[in-house]
Amino acid sequence: MLEAKNLTCIRDDRCLFQQLSFCIAPGEIVQIEGPNGAGKTSLLRILAGLAEADEGQVNWRDKNIRRDRAKYHQDLLFLGHQPGIKSVLTPFENLLFYQSVFQKVDSAAIWQALAQVGLVGYEDLPVSQLSAGQQRRVALARLWLSPAPLWILDEPLTAIDKQGVSTLLALFVQHAAKGGMVLLTTHQDLGAVSHNVRKICLANTQEKSCLSACCAVN
């Protein structure tokens, strides 16, 4: 279980959220909602252990993630705004490298992941020669290879066509059905997802005081 405990985040003298607490249990899909500037990306980075909260802590399986960040990151797949892939490598080589870090290499699984994101035929091109959208799809292909139980995804559906969105949403449902956890931000309507999606809404009136920030959990 992932637990956010009394998290407060202040950026540029502005409080994005204050005393925010919630838990995510195995089998859940959770969407972080809120207007631009409400702190959605900051929250995801804090939960992923890539940024520090001004107050509070993040627990994974009842332990503060600061105690063993490396072990926590073995259980986590984080996809941010940047693809996080190596531009000098090809899509196939990027996925091969990613897979080799966590598990035994399975070339067939890599080919299947490339097929799922529509990159068969581009597997031998350096990533630097691909469009921004194609680079994004290389990053998303890691979802089909990841053994991590916790997925934290910042706008994973951006610049993805309708069929691609449907494919990704089906994968999220499949991951949750196996006991995984999916935490994401998106501007897409998830009403059609065949799985209960819990929503955490961050609201911020853009005032300087922390008292102006609030959070509602649906």
Curated annotation (Swiss-Prot):
Main location: membrane
Keyword field contains Nucleotide-binding: yes
UniProt-recorded Gene Ontology molecular function terms: ABC-type heme transporter activity; ATP binding; ATP hydrolysis activity
Name of the protein this chain belongs to: Cytochrome c biogenesis ATP-binding export protein CcmA
Purpose of the protein: Part of the ABC transporter complex CcmAB involved in the biogenesis of c-type cytochromes; once thought to export heme, this seems not to be the case, but its exact role is uncertain. Responsible for energy coupling to the transport system.
Enzyme class: translocase
Residues annotated for ATP binding in this entry: 34-41
Domain of life: Bacteria
Gene name linked to the record: ccmA
Coiled coil: none
CDD domains: ABC_CcmA_heme_exporter (cd03231)
EC number: 7.6.2.5
Domain ABC transporter stretches: 2-217
Alphabetized NCBIfam families for the sequence: ccmA, PRK13538.1
Self-association and partners: The complex is composed of two ATP-binding proteins (CcmA) and two transmembrane proteins (CcmB).
Compartments where located: Cell inner membrane
Family named by the database record: Belongs to the ABC transporter superfamily. CcmA exporter (TC 3.A.1.107) family.
